[in-house]
């Protein structure tokens, strides 16, 4: 069984006031020390005071990112950074790009350029009881690639920051007053059927 721990931080970006950057820092491991089970999907959950300004930033298409790498994406489309640490050792940089999917939905592409990995994250309103604390989530579904789940690589730590500025706009904003606790979380679903929810609060800067 996977065990998850995580923290989140929120800081003001270069524009200040309502403009922020949100970082999720998640760790996963097993009691036995074995490789964690492969993920099926994740949802990054954002406080109900937070908005994500996908319409104010240029977009990078998945096909462009896959064919040309980050160099092919237009200026202003990069909206986040991060780092992946892998089970068994090694790490790699992570980058986040604003995108529009073929079905018209908006969201981001989280990529590990060194591995050629691209993860689709659709921006969606949360549903059910999650609406008590959250308004939006970035929903990531890990597509099967023919590799058996037990043979897939696994991360022991994944850090991702959502935040950027472009022509006077911030990618992430919060209308909460300074000092108010912000709810942030990560919902996880693994190929074993296990479901986890890691939640916490951080003061609005």
Predicted regions and their residues:
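Ser/Thr/Pro/Gly-rich, low-complexity intrinsically disordered stalk/linker tracts of secreted
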Residues: 1-205
